[in-house]
Amino acid sequence: MTISLTPLDLSAIRADFPILKRVMRGGNQLAYLDSGATSQRPVQVLDAEREFLVTSNGAVHRGAHQLMEEATDAYERGRVDIAAFIGAAADELVFTKNATESLNLVSYVFGDNRFEGTSGDGGDVIVTTELEHHANLIPWQELARRIGATLRWYGVTDDGQIDLDSLQLDERVKVVAFSHHSNVTGAVAPVRELVARAKEVGALTVLDACQSVPHQPVDLHGLGVDFAAFSGHKMLGPNGIGVLYARRELLSVMPPFLTGGSMIETVTMESTTYAPAPQRFEAGTPMTSQVVGLAAAARYLDAIGMKAVEAHERELVAAAVEGLSRIDGVRIIGPKSMENRGSPVSFVVDGVHAHDIGQVLDDDGVAVRVGHHCALPLHRRFALAATARASFAVYNTVDEVDRLVAGVLRALDFFGRE
């Protein structure tokens, strides 16, 4: 794949996303500000998937014919490219159907007595944060229920960041799970500090990186986390593909989550021995074309340069926070400054329900998310039923931020001002 870009040539980038040219039902061109929920795909990703399907589609790791060989090569080459994009080794990556499955895989293994992640004596503690997406909370609730452990969590400060003073860890803690970027407040976690605290008590760390991998340079080896998860559809890639990263020495001793074909060494009627990692964790027919598409997305972002992506998105977020903060009656849920802040910008408007904000913006062709964003405990922390959320990607413009602010003003005039 070739992509010719000057430093963040927005015209060239936007030309790669045909959907951005769409005129919506209100007669306005689409301003897509919902990439935190799912991102749009560039033609390079669509073309990579299509090229694979029309030329090399075959069963991976099975048989000896040419299509099988080409499919297997494409699948494993994709693993190499994706691993390089996040600062990991290829044999440390497991493909799943989404980040939720990746996090469930890890939590399931922690409850398996073949893995020495927990003691199983009922005295273990599992730690997460009040900021979490349900995908990084409910699996740990279930693990605590299954093994009789206690679930504890870091609280949240009034500006939507992890409150490091709210919890002290001890040797009973076995796992600390947290998000790199909050999908609601946009707060960036102090990853190295949390990893250091976990290591002091012998706990393992699990990072939900869904909101960070598409938006900034991420080096998982450099961060020092033990596990990490992210989804393809949030980083310009296909639906139906997620990634689990695990340190090699952990992955090599972890028992499987799902069992069946493709993940075995030998099978008898009495017992089974399993393939080495990562194949041990990829039971059944894999999502080959989606891996090809996700690898194309990683190459696309890498060609632009993740530092340039991060700088561009910081400009957009700063403009959104500043513009919304100037509106009387609008409250940002999250940090007001750009220090330790990611892409999502969530807000509420006095006297106007979030769904009404979303409807007015939709009439203007501006797509945002409204609701609790799969983070009910966090919304309860702020005594809110719902927020509106704008979230940005490399293809967004300052003009689209201006349209967001104008739409909120229009909604406030219509619903909230006498």
From Swiss-Prot:
Enzyme class: transferase
Catalysed reactions listed for this entry: (sulfur carrier)-H + L-cysteine = (sulfur carrier)-SH + L-alanine
Example of a GO MF term: cysteine desulfurase activity
Active site: C374 (cysteine persulfide intermediate)
N6-(pyridoxal phosphate)lysine PTM positions: K234
Keywords: Pyridoxal phosphate, Transferase
Origin superkingdom: Bacteria
EC number: 2.8.1.7
A biological process from GO: cysteine metabolic process
Cofactor(s) required, per the database record: pyridoxal 5'-phosphate
A Pfam family it matches: Aminotran_5
InterPro entries in the cross-refs: Aminotrans_V_dom, Aminotrans_V_PyrdxlP_BS, Cys_dSase_SufS, PyrdxlP-dep_Trfase, PyrdxlP-dep_Trfase_major, PyrdxlP-dep_Trfase_small
Transmembrane residue ranges: none
Transferase among keywords: yes
Free-text function comment from the UniProt entry: Catalyzes the removal of elemental sulfur and selenium atoms from L-cysteine, L-cystine, L-selenocysteine, and L-selenocystine to produce L-alanine.
Assigned protein family: Belongs to the class-V pyridoxal-phosphate-dependent aminotransferase family. Csd subfamily.
Name of this chain's protein: Probable cysteine desulfurase 2
Species name: Mycobacterium leprae (strain TN)
